[in-house]
A protein has these predicted regions:
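Short, small/polar-rich loop/turn modules that mediate ligand/substrate recognition or access, typified
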Residues: 83, 184-189, 262-264
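Active-site helix of classical SDR
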Residues: 122, 168, 176
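Substrate-binding pocket helix/loop in short-chain dehydrogenase/reductase
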Residues: 98-99, 103-111, 232
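Canonical Rossmann dinucleotide-binding motif of NAD(H)/NADP(H)-dependent dehydrogenases/reductases
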Residues: 3-35
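Residue(s) in the substrate-gating loop at a strand-loop-helix junction
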Residues: 152
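Alpha-helical segment proximal to the catalytic Tyr-Lys
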Residues: 127, 181-182, 260
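Short C-terminal tail/terminal secondary-structure segment
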Residues: 2-4, 157, 234, 250-253, ...
Length: 275
Protein backbone atom coordinates (compact mmCIF):
# COMPACT_ATOMS: atom_id res chain seq x y z
CA UNK A 1 0.00 0.00 0.00
CA UNK A 2 1.49 3.40 -1.00
CA UNK A 3 0.28 5.08 2.20
CA UNK A 4 -0.51 4.38 5.82
CA UNK A 5 -3.28 5.72 8.02
CA UNK A 6 -1.53 4.63 11.20
CA UNK A 7 -2.25 7.09 13.99
CA UNK A 8 -5.42 8.36 12.30
CA UNK A 9 -8.90 8.03 13.77
CA UNK A 10 -12.06 7.72 11.68
CA UNK A 11 -15.81 7.76 12.18
CA UNK A 12 -17.80 5.66 9.73
CA UNK A 13 -21.58 5.92 10.01
CA UNK A 14 -23.85 3.19 8.72
CA UNK A 15 -21.05 0.69 9.27
CA UNK A 16 -23.06 -2.26 10.53
CA UNK A 17 -23.20 -3.85 7.10
CA UNK A 18 -22.63 -3.38 3.39
CA UNK A 19 -20.60 -0.46 2.12
CA UNK A 20 -20.05 1.00 5.58
CA UNK A 21 -18.55 -2.23 6.87
CA UNK A 22 -16.34 -2.45 3.77
CA UNK A 23 -15.15 1.14 4.30
CA UNK A 24 -14.28 0.37 7.92
CA UNK A 25 -12.40 -2.74 6.80
CA UNK A 26 -10.33 -0.72 4.34
CA UNK A 27 -9.52 1.93 6.94
CA UNK A 28 -8.49 -0.58 9.60
CA UNK A 29 -6.34 -2.45 7.07
CA UNK A 30 -4.60 0.85 6.28
CA UNK A 31 -3.78 1.35 9.96
CA UNK A 32 -6.55 3.66 11.19
CA UNK A 33 -8.57 3.36 14.38
CA UNK A 34 -12.29 3.43 13.63
CA UNK A 35 -15.47 4.28 15.51
CA UNK A 36 -18.39 2.37 14.00
CA UNK A 37 -21.94 3.69 14.20
CA UNK A 38 -25.20 2.10 13.16
CA UNK A 39 -28.80 1.81 14.27
CA UNK A 40 -28.42 -1.96 14.67
CA UNK A 41 -26.17 -2.80 17.63
CA UNK A 42 -26.04 -6.51 16.75
CA UNK A 43 -24.77 -5.75 13.25
CA UNK A 44 -22.24 -3.30 14.70
CA UNK A 45 -20.74 -6.03 16.85
CA UNK A 46 -20.61 -8.33 13.82
CA UNK A 47 -18.74 -5.62 11.93
CA UNK A 48 -16.27 -5.14 14.76
CA UNK A 49 -15.57 -8.86 15.04
CA UNK A 50 -15.09 -9.15 11.27
CA UNK A 51 -12.31 -6.57 11.14
CA UNK A 52 -8.65 -7.53 11.09
CA UNK A 53 -7.72 -5.68 14.28
CA UNK A 54 -10.79 -5.20 16.50
CA UNK A 55 -8.59 -3.65 19.21
CA UNK A 56 -8.46 -0.50 17.07
CA UNK A 57 -12.23 -0.45 16.66
CA UNK A 58 -15.02 0.74 18.93
CA UNK A 59 -18.76 0.97 18.38
CA UNK A 60 -21.56 3.32 19.35
CA UNK A 61 -25.10 2.39 18.40
CA UNK A 62 -27.69 5.08 17.87
CA UNK A 63 -30.23 6.62 15.53
CA UNK A 64 -28.41 9.50 13.85
CA UNK A 65 -31.68 11.22 13.03
CA UNK A 66 -32.05 11.87 16.77
CA UNK A 67 -30.65 15.42 17.08
CA UNK A 68 -28.52 14.44 20.10
CA UNK A 69 -26.83 11.36 18.63
CA UNK A 70 -24.36 12.91 16.14
CA UNK A 71 -22.64 14.86 18.92
CA UNK A 72 -22.59 11.71 21.08
CA UNK A 73 -20.79 9.86 18.28
CA UNK A 74 -18.17 12.60 17.99
CA UNK A 75 -17.67 12.83 21.75
CA UNK A 76 -17.39 9.05 22.12
CA UNK A 77 -14.73 9.00 19.40
CA UNK A 78 -12.68 11.73 21.07
CA UNK A 79 -13.02 10.11 24.49
CA UNK A 80 -11.91 6.72 23.19
CA UNK A 81 -9.23 7.60 20.65
CA UNK A 82 -8.32 11.20 21.68
CA UNK A 83 -8.34 12.42 18.07
CA UNK A 84 -10.52 12.66 14.97
CA UNK A 85 -9.02 12.78 11.50
CA UNK A 86 -11.51 11.19 9.10
CA UNK A 87 -15.31 11.38 8.94
CA UNK A 88 -17.27 9.22 6.50
CA UNK A 89 -20.97 10.09 6.38
CA UNK A 90 -22.30 6.85 4.93
CA UNK A 91 -25.51 6.13 6.87
CA UNK A 92 -28.64 6.00 4.74
CA UNK A 93 -31.59 4.09 3.38
CA UNK A 94 -34.18 4.57 0.66
CA UNK A 95 -37.91 5.15 1.19
CA UNK A 96 -39.11 5.59 -2.34
CA UNK A 97 -42.15 6.89 -4.16
CA UNK A 98 -43.22 9.30 -6.88
CA UNK A 99 -43.92 12.84 -5.75
CA UNK A 100 -47.73 12.63 -5.66
CA UNK A 101 -47.54 9.63 -3.33
CA UNK A 102 -44.77 10.97 -1.08
CA UNK A 103 -45.91 12.29 2.29
CA UNK A 104 -44.24 15.16 4.12
CA UNK A 105 -42.99 12.65 6.70
CA UNK A 106 -41.46 10.41 4.03
CA UNK A 107 -39.75 13.31 2.26
CA UNK A 108 -38.42 14.74 5.52
CA UNK A 109 -37.11 11.33 6.58
CA UNK A 110 -34.92 11.21 3.47
CA UNK A 111 -33.59 14.72 4.10
CA UNK A 112 -32.96 13.90 7.76
CA UNK A 113 -30.76 10.86 7.18
CA UNK A 114 -28.98 11.97 4.00
CA UNK A 115 -28.50 15.70 4.61
CA UNK A 116 -29.37 16.81 8.15
CA UNK A 117 -27.44 13.98 9.82
CA UNK A 118 -24.12 14.74 8.02
CA UNK A 119 -24.63 18.44 8.81
CA UNK A 120 -25.10 17.72 12.53
CA UNK A 121 -22.17 15.33 12.73
CA UNK A 122 -19.81 17.75 11.01
CA UNK A 123 -21.05 20.67 13.10
CA UNK A 124 -20.39 18.62 16.24
CA UNK A 125 -16.84 17.90 15.05
CA UNK A 126 -16.07 21.46 13.97
CA UNK A 127 -14.70 22.80 17.27
CA UNK A 128 -12.20 19.95 17.64
CA UNK A 129 -11.12 20.15 14.00
CA UNK A 130 -10.56 23.91 14.11
CA UNK A 131 -8.68 23.93 17.41
CA UNK A 132 -6.48 20.99 16.42
CA UNK A 133 -5.62 22.66 13.12
CA UNK A 134 -4.77 25.97 14.79
CA UNK A 135 -2.44 24.21 17.23
CA UNK A 136 -0.74 22.27 14.44
CA UNK A 137 -0.29 25.31 12.21
CA UNK A 138 1.10 27.36 15.10
CA UNK A 139 3.76 24.66 15.49
CA UNK A 140 4.53 24.79 11.77
CA UNK A 141 2.82 21.51 10.89
CA UNK A 142 0.32 20.77 8.14
CA UNK A 143 -1.91 17.86 9.16
CA UNK A 144 -4.61 16.99 6.66
CA UNK A 145 -8.02 15.78 7.80
CA UNK A 146 -10.67 14.18 5.65
CA UNK A 147 -14.44 14.34 5.25
CA UNK A 148 -16.16 12.01 2.80
CA UNK A 149 -19.89 12.40 2.28
CA UNK A 150 -21.74 9.65 0.44
CA UNK A 151 -24.06 10.71 -2.35
CA UNK A 152 -25.53 8.85 -5.32
CA UNK A 153 -26.13 9.10 -9.03
CA UNK A 154 -29.74 9.58 -7.94
CA UNK A 155 -28.54 12.87 -6.46
CA UNK A 156 -26.41 13.94 -9.41
CA UNK A 157 -28.75 12.75 -12.17
CA UNK A 158 -32.18 12.44 -10.52
CA UNK A 159 -34.16 9.20 -10.55
CA UNK A 160 -37.92 8.79 -11.06
CA UNK A 161 -39.60 7.36 -7.98
CA UNK A 162 -36.90 8.62 -5.61
CA UNK A 163 -37.93 12.22 -5.08
CA UNK A 164 -36.93 12.24 -1.41
CA UNK A 165 -33.79 10.14 -1.71
CA UNK A 166 -32.56 12.08 -4.74
CA UNK A 167 -33.19 15.40 -2.99
CA UNK A 168 -31.26 14.37 0.11
CA UNK A 169 -28.36 13.03 -1.93
CA UNK A 170 -28.28 16.20 -4.04
CA UNK A 171 -28.32 18.36 -0.93
CA UNK A 172 -25.27 16.69 0.57
CA UNK A 173 -23.29 17.74 -2.51
CA UNK A 174 -24.04 21.37 -1.66
CA UNK A 175 -22.96 20.71 1.93
CA UNK A 176 -19.74 19.13 0.65
CA UNK A 177 -18.79 21.99 -1.65
CA UNK A 178 -19.60 24.66 0.93
CA UNK A 179 -17.68 22.98 3.74
CA UNK A 180 -14.70 22.48 1.42
CA UNK A 181 -14.50 26.27 1.16
CA UNK A 182 -15.11 26.88 4.87
CA UNK A 183 -12.64 24.27 6.14
CA UNK A 184 -9.86 24.52 3.56
CA UNK A 185 -8.05 26.98 5.84
CA UNK A 186 -7.97 24.25 8.50
CA UNK A 187 -6.34 21.72 6.14
CA UNK A 188 -9.48 19.63 5.70
CA UNK A 189 -10.32 17.93 2.41
CA UNK A 190 -14.10 17.66 2.02
CA UNK A 191 -15.27 15.48 -0.85
CA UNK A 192 -18.14 13.21 -1.84
CA UNK A 193 -18.41 9.81 -3.47
CA UNK A 194 -21.52 9.13 -5.53
CA UNK A 195 -22.44 5.49 -5.92
CA UNK A 196 -24.28 3.82 -8.73
CA UNK A 197 -25.87 0.45 -8.01
CA UNK A 198 -23.79 -1.46 -5.47
CA UNK A 199 -24.55 -4.96 -4.19
CA UNK A 200 -26.31 -4.07 -0.93
CA UNK A 201 -29.77 -4.70 0.45
CA UNK A 202 -30.97 -1.49 -1.24
CA UNK A 203 -30.64 -3.09 -4.68
CA UNK A 204 -31.50 -6.72 -3.93
CA UNK A 205 -34.68 -8.20 -5.46
CA UNK A 206 -37.84 -7.01 -3.72
CA UNK A 207 -38.76 -10.53 -2.64
CA UNK A 208 -35.33 -11.33 -1.20
CA UNK A 209 -34.85 -12.14 2.46
CA UNK A 210 -34.11 -8.96 4.40
CA UNK A 211 -35.52 -6.66 1.71
CA UNK A 212 -37.23 -4.47 4.29
CA UNK A 213 -36.52 -2.53 7.46
CA UNK A 214 -38.37 -0.92 10.35
CA UNK A 215 -37.82 2.79 10.86
CA UNK A 216 -39.73 5.10 13.19
CA UNK A 217 -42.75 2.83 13.22
CA UNK A 218 -42.82 2.28 9.46
CA UNK A 219 -42.21 -0.94 7.56
CA UNK A 220 -40.08 0.14 4.60
CA UNK A 221 -39.56 -2.07 1.58
CA UNK A 222 -36.05 -2.12 0.18
CA UNK A 223 -34.71 -3.48 -3.08
CA UNK A 224 -35.83 -3.24 -6.70
CA UNK A 225 -37.79 -5.24 -9.25
CA UNK A 226 -35.65 -8.04 -10.78
CA UNK A 227 -36.50 -6.85 -14.30
CA UNK A 228 -35.13 -3.40 -13.41
CA UNK A 229 -31.89 -4.92 -12.14
CA UNK A 230 -31.39 -6.67 -15.46
CA UNK A 231 -32.11 -3.43 -17.31
CA UNK A 232 -29.59 -1.50 -15.23
CA UNK A 233 -26.89 -4.11 -15.75
CA UNK A 234 -27.45 -3.88 -19.49
CA UNK A 235 -27.22 -0.07 -19.36
CA UNK A 236 -24.04 -0.07 -17.26
CA UNK A 237 -20.87 0.07 -19.39
CA UNK A 238 -19.19 -2.46 -17.09
CA UNK A 239 -22.23 -4.73 -17.32
CA UNK A 240 -22.62 -5.48 -13.61
CA UNK A 241 -23.30 -4.07 -10.18
CA UNK A 242 -20.43 -2.87 -8.04
CA UNK A 243 -19.29 -4.63 -4.88
CA UNK A 244 -19.09 -2.99 -1.44
CA UNK A 245 -15.32 -3.49 -1.56
CA UNK A 246 -15.08 -1.57 -4.85
CA UNK A 247 -17.24 1.20 -3.40
CA UNK A 248 -15.02 1.36 -0.33
CA UNK A 249 -11.95 1.73 -2.53
CA UNK A 250 -13.26 5.01 -3.92
CA UNK A 251 -13.88 6.26 -0.38
CA UNK A 252 -10.42 5.17 0.76
CA UNK A 253 -8.84 7.40 -1.89
CA UNK A 254 -10.49 10.45 -0.32
CA UNK A 255 -9.43 9.30 3.17
CA UNK A 256 -5.80 8.93 2.15
CA UNK A 257 -2.86 11.29 1.52
CA UNK A 258 -3.33 10.61 -2.20
CA UNK A 259 -6.17 13.16 -2.14
CA UNK A 260 -4.43 15.88 -0.12
CA UNK A 261 -4.85 18.43 -2.93
CA UNK A 262 -8.41 17.44 -3.86
CA UNK A 263 -11.38 19.14 -2.19
CA UNK A 264 -14.96 20.04 -2.99
CA UNK A 265 -15.22 17.27 -5.59
CA UNK A 266 -17.68 14.46 -6.33
CA UNK A 267 -16.24 11.14 -7.51
CA UNK A 268 -18.79 8.89 -9.20
CA UNK A 269 -18.26 5.19 -8.51
CA UNK A 270 -20.91 3.59 -10.66
CA UNK A 271 -19.31 1.54 -13.39
CA UNK A 272 -20.08 4.29 -15.89
CA UNK A 273 -23.83 4.14 -15.22
CA UNK A 274 -25.89 7.33 -15.29
CA UNK A 275 -29.66 7.61 -15.02
Amino acid sequence: MPFSLEGKTAIVTGSGRGIGRAIARRLVAAGASVMLNDLDEHMLQESRESLSDPERVDVIAGDLTDPQVPAKVVNATLNTFKSLDIIVNNAGYSWDNVIQKTSDEQFQAMLDIHLVTPFRLLRAASAHIKEAAKTEMAAGHRVMRKVVNITSISGTDGNPGQVGYSSGKAGVIGLTKTLAKEWGRYNVNVNAVGFGLIETRLVQPLDAEGASMEMHGHHIRLGVQPILLDSVKNACPLGRLGTPEEAAGAVLFFCSPLSDYVTGEVLICGGGLHF
